[in-house]
Amino acid sequence: MIESPHNEKLKLVRRLRERKHREREGLFATEGEDLLEAGLVAGAEPRFVLVAAGSGLEGEEVEPGLLASVSSLGSGTRVIAAWPTPESDRTQLFPHTGKNYVRFPCLYLHGVGDPGNVGTIVRTADALIDGPVVLGADCADPFSPKAVRASMGSIFSRPPLRAGVETTPEPRAALVAHGGDGLEALDGAATLCLGAEREGLPEEVLKACAVQATIPLRPGGPDSLNVAAAAAIAAQRISSLAMREGRTDA
């Protein structure tokens, strides 16, 4: 049983809270039984699994107070696992024409800096579309603790890509807070582009899009939506249309 705070695995878990160490080590950490199970179901192999002594879980036992001390959640943590960062499938990004593209389009994010939003959008994509999530400039690390928790395990089955908007399939549609066409403008889009709630999409991304669409909001309510909520609404529209049309993979 691990009883020393100087144990190398505990020190590694602490380091994995920071992006620079996750990238250097090629690892990220999860906490909780649900995320451990999600990783195993997806076929991922943890580097190691640390469990609170007396929890009855499988793994290397750690004195409970020590395990809590390296947790990003605090007390109550029963299991922490370290995993190799999964490789994204870049073959999902290639030119398409007409209806001859992946059944549901990809989501492209630019400047979405909140890891909770990134993780939630990864989960939404896993639920609604077959194409990848593509992270452009200034997006949060999808393997940060908050993003991993928000993805609810989808980070294993649908790890996002990092690429520029120019790599994504055409035609592209931009989701904008104001001044766009109705959501019907999204119909037929191969890539849905979204930006942060406050800043929106930069001009270079808007220019790469064939259309712009705006989600209609009720008068007197908020003037914009959280980007994760907007992504869910728009992705559901596109996926419903694709299922009705019976699109198939290229």
Where are these regions (language model features)?
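Short, acidic/turn-prone active-site loops that include or flank metal/cofactor-
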Residues: 54, 64-67, 138-140, 197-199, ...
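N-terminal positively charged helical leader segments and presequences
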Residues: 1-79, 96-97, 250
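Glycine/charged-rich beta-loop-alpha catalytic/anionic-binding loops adjacent to active sites
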Residues: 59-62, 102-107, 208-219
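Active-site/ligand-binding-proximal alpha/beta "capping" segment
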Residues: 174-221
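Short, hydrophobic beta-strand segments that form beta-sheet elements in well-ordered domains
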Residues: 28-30, 45-53, 160-162, 171-177, ...
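Glycine- and other small-residue-rich loops at beta-strand/loop junctions that grip anionic moieties
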Residues: 2, 28, 110-111, 136-137, ...
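Structured adenosyl-cofactor binding patch, chiefly the S-adenosyl-L-methionine
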Residues: 81, 124-128, 139-156, 203, ...
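RNA substrate-binding interface of SAM-dependent RNA methyltransferases
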Residues: 86-180
